[in-house]
Amino acid sequence: MSNYEIMILANPDSTLEQVSELLFSVLKKSDTKIEKLERSELAYPIHKLTRATYYLVTVKSDPQLMAELTRKLNIAKFILRSLIINLDSEKGLKPRKVKRFIPRAKNNDRSANQGDRRPFIRRNQTTDASKTEASTEATASKQSEQTTTKPRTRKVSKEQ
């Protein structure tokens, strides 16, 4: 025997007796609790109706009886929609893991955080002194070549 919760949207002209008669034709009265919730406006029309009455039913029953009840709810003309939830097998929401708050250091000095920082090193660079000297000489020669070339001049038209 499992616990079930049934939400029923019924025609607003239907009565509690009609709904309970339909439910008790399948279920036992001792294990069933019917609660009329409210009559409210629907978000969209169902069978050309814009209002419906909500019923909440809690039941302790066998799955075979719930299958029969589902069939009868689908056949009944005054039932607009129904939803059956097995409360025993429904997992529901799990609580979130809360991340712990770690406050920042109260000192806003940059010197306090210097121990955490590492200098940026390119992967191609090495610490060998001979290679660094060679690379500086190469860059110096490239710069001197760039300065020896003539700069481009823009032609200005005299028609302006």
UniProtKB/Swiss-Prot annotation:
<comment type="function">
    <text>Binds together with bS18 to 16S ribosomal RNA.</text>
</comment>
<dbReference type="InterPro" id="IPR020814">
    <property type="entry name" value="Ribosomal_S6_plastid/chlpt"/>
</dbReference>
<keyword id="KW-0689">Ribosomal protein</keyword>
<dbReference type="GO" id="GO:0006412">
    <property type="term" value="P:translation"/>
</dbReference>
<dbReference type="InterPro" id="IPR014717">
    <property type="entry name" value="Transl_elong_EF1B/ribsomal_bS6"/>
</dbReference>
<keyword id="KW-0699">rRNA-binding</keyword>
<feature type="compositionally biased region" description="Low complexity">
    <location>
        <begin position="126"/>
        <end position="145"/>
    </location>
</feature>
<feature type="compositionally biased region" description="Basic residues">
    <location>
        <begin position="151"/>
        <end position="160"/>
    </location>
</feature>
<keyword id="KW-0694">RNA-binding</keyword>
<dbReference type="InterPro" id="IPR035980">
    <property type="entry name" value="Ribosomal_bS6_sf"/>
</dbReference>
<dbReference type="GO" id="GO:1990904">
    <property type="term" value="C:ribonucleoprotein complex"/>
</dbReference>
<comment type="similarity">
    <text>Belongs to the bacterial ribosomal protein bS6 family.</text>
</comment>
<protein>
    <recommendedName>
        <fullName>Small ribosomal subunit protein bS6</fullName>
    </recommendedName>
</protein>
<dbReference type="GO" id="GO:0019843">
    <property type="term" value="F:rRNA binding"/>
</dbReference>
<dbReference type="InterPro" id="IPR000529">
    <property type="entry name" value="Ribosomal_bS6"/>
</dbReference>
<dbReference type="GO" id="GO:0005840">
    <property type="term" value="C:ribosome"/>
</dbReference>
<feature type="region of interest" description="Disordered">
    <location>
        <begin position="96"/>
        <end position="160"/>
    </location>
</feature>
<keyword id="KW-0687">Ribonucleoprotein</keyword>
<dbReference type="GO" id="GO:0003735">
    <property type="term" value="F:structural constituent of ribosome"/>
</dbReference>
<dbReference type="Pfam" id="PF01250">
    <property type="entry name" value="Ribosomal_S6"/>
</dbReference>
